[in-house]
């Protein structure tokens, strides 16, 4: 049976959660790695993020993917319009899985030209990888 008080209480809790999530700032650049050879996220992959300035690469963040294959929290500031590069340590990832890997690392270079969130997915296997502009 419909209970007005209970429904109001439930809605209030949901609104509080939404407001809390909106106030949390997401990194302007994120990544997600899926291992297509297993059909699962690639956890514990070391990733470095660089920005290019004066024709030199400068390390601005690094981390490891979580159990869902994601890094979402490595930058807490806005980023400048520039060229960026992610380096993914595939050699260590596949060594830990006791699998051979043809590519010891993957590099993805991309250019930011707006203030939108930029999600850079990587689909990988021991003998290939691909990427695309995520959402």
Question: What do the PLM-derived regions correspond to, one by one?
Answer:
Residues 16-43, 51, 57, 129:
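Beta-strand-rich domain onsets/edges
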Residues 37, 45, 61-63, 75:
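Short hydrophobic alpha-helix segments
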């Amino acid at each position: 049976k419909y209970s007005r008080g209970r429904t109001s209480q439930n809605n209030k809790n949901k609104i509080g959660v939404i407001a809390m999530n909106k106030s949390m700032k997401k990194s302007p650049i994120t990544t997600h790695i899926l291992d297509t050879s297993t059909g699962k996220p690639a956890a514990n992959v070391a990733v470095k993020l660089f920005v290019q300035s004066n024709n030199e690469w400068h390390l601005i963040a690094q981390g490891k993917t979580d159990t869902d294959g994601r890094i979402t929290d490595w930058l807490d500031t806005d980023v400048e319009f520039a060229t960026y590069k992610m380096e993914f340590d595939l050699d260590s990832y596949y060594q830990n899985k006791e699998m051979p890997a043809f590519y010891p690392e993957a590099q993805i270079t991309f250019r930011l030209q707006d203030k939108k969130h930029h999600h850079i997915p990587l689909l990988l296997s021991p003998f290939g990888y691909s990427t695309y502009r995520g959402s």
